[in-house]
A protein has these predicted regions:
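H-loop (His-switch) and adjacent beta-strand-loop-beta switch element
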Residues: 200-212
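Catalytic Walker B motif of ABC-type/P-loop ATPase nucleotide-binding domains
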Residues: 152-156
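Helix-to-loop junction immediately C-terminal to a conserved catalytic motif
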Residues: 48
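ABC ATPase nucleotide-binding domains
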Residues: 214-258
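Conserved ABC ATPase signature
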Residues: 127-131, 135
């Protein structure tokens, strides 16, 4: 179980998270949601120990950092680096000392199987610079899968990709959760959260709500977090988990300490 207790984080002289407490049970599929600048990615990076808490504690239960796989935002990765898909996957997953040493047979089989899972079969030798945005994101998922981690942390896994790729990769996430893995994802698209994530954590610097997604995404919680609707009924649509693809939500304001 992941336990966050009285977590406060100051980032660039701003308070990014203010006295957050929540728990994530083993095997949960959880979305972290909130407006831009709410502290979603900050919370994920604290779980990854990339950012240290100013005050408070984070415990990973029985697991160590070796049991965690992290999927970063794809926009933070240089796609022009001269490296093949299989080299990129193995370097990130196994921290190889050299991109170009020969693969073991076991490594090659794991890479090939992961690429089949994300529908990139046969693309091991392709340069990453040749991949489309959706293919690049599928490759990042493959790198995450071969780590065999028990806890998966994903930062905006569906940003800037098409709807079909999002659906395909959501199926991969659900498969991981069905295998007993704990999956925590920072999410921007509330319609996907409403459709696929049983649990959610809503933050707006402070914790607004956490628990069952249908309860967390109630209109008064979203409004308290700083969301506003283009159309008044959209909050009710999310709450009812009905026709979520038609829901339009936008943050009330922009911040910069995410």
């Amino acid at each position: 179980m992941i336990s966050v207790t009285n977590l406060t984080v100051f980032y660039r002289n701003n308070i990014a998270l203010d006295n957050i407490s929540c728990t994530i049970k083993d095997g949960d599929l959880v979305a972290i949601v909130g407006p831009n600048g709410a502290g979603k990615s900050t919370l994920l990076k604290v779980l990854m120990k990339q950012i240290a808490p100013t005050t408070g504690k984070v415990r990973l239960g029985q697991y160590s950092m070796k049991n965690i796989a992290y999927l970063p935002q794809s926009t933070h990765i240089d796609r022009n680096f001269p490296i093949t898909v299989e080299e990129f996957i193995s370097a990130g997953a196994w921290r190889r000392s050299s991109f170009w040493r020969r693969f073991t047979q076991a490594e090659y089989q794991k890479i090939s199987q992961a690429l089949v899972t994300v529908q990139l079969s046969g693309m091991e030798k392709r340069q990453i610079s040749e991949l489309s945005g959706g293919q690049f994101q599928r490759m990042l998922f493959a790198r995450m899968l071969i780590q065999d981690a028990q806890i998966l942390l994903l930062d905006e896994p569906f940003a800037a990709i098409d709807a079909q790729t999002s659906e395909d990769l959501m199926a991969v996430i659900r498969g991981c959760q069905q295998q007993g893995k704990t999956v925590v994802a920072v999410m921007h698209d509330l319609s996907l959260v409403a459709r696929y994530f049983p649990e959610a954590i809503l933050v707006a610097t402070q914790l607004i709500a956490n628990g069952n997604t249908k309860t967390v995404l109630q209109s008064h919680h979203l409004q308290q977090a700083g969301y506003q609707a283009y159309l008044t009924p959209c909050f009710d649509q999310i709450h009812a988990l009905s026709t979520p693809q038609n829901v339009a939500i936008k943050p009330q304001q922009e911040c910069h300490h995410e």
